């Protein structure tokens, strides 16, 4: 089984071909292809290539499946004994992708 570790949106993801993944929002239309050049590691069976910091010539190709928002994260700020409470919520945007190829 081959897999790779990519960097996008300030986070690292371990990806394999055919896998679906929710990442930070990308400004790319649904159905279009996206290429990730920042590949930190590529493994193909027993052969593992680790980049310093990235693997030269490696890229991961994916297709944008959908755009959406995660479930709401709710927070409450509360001050004891002061009869003060503040409720807030946030929904983060995401892009769902399908990994179509790993090239090393």
Curated annotation (Swiss-Prot):
Task: Give the superkingdom in one word.
Answer: Bacteria
Q: Name one GO biological process term.
A: translation
User: Key word NADP present in the record?
Assistant: no
Q: Which UniProt keywords apply?
A: Ribonucleoprotein, Ribosomal protein, RNA-binding, rRNA-binding
Q: Which Pfam families match?
A: Ribosomal_L21p
Task: Please give the InterPro entries that the UniProt record associates with this protein.
Answer: bL21-like (IPR028909), bL21-like_sf (IPR036164), Ribosomal_bL21 (IPR001787), Ribosomal_bL21_CS (IPR018258)
- A Gene Ontology term for the protein's cellular component: cytoplasm
GO molecular-function terms, A-Z? rRNA binding; structural constituent of ribosome
**What is this protein's function?**
This protein binds to 23S rRNA in the presence of protein L20.
Family of this protein: Belongs to the bacterial ribosomal protein bL21 family.
Q: How does it assemble?
A: Part of the 50S ribosomal subunit. Contacts protein L20.
Q: What is this protein called?
A: Large ribosomal subunit protein bL21
This protein's encoding gene: rplU
């Amino acid at each position: 089984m081959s897999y790779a570790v990519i960097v996008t949106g300030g986070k690292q993801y371990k990806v394999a071909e055919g896998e679906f993944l929710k990442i930070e929002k990308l400004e790319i239309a649904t159905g279009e292809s996206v290429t990730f050049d920042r590949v930190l590691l590529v493994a193909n069976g027993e052969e593992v290539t680790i980049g310093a910091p990235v693997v030269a010539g490696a890229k991961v190709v994916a297709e944008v499946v959908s755009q959406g928002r995660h479930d709401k994260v709710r927070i409450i700020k509360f001050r004891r004994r002061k009869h003060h409470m503040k409720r807030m919520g946030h929904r983060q945007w995401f892009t769902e992708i399908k990994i179509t190829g790993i090239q090393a």
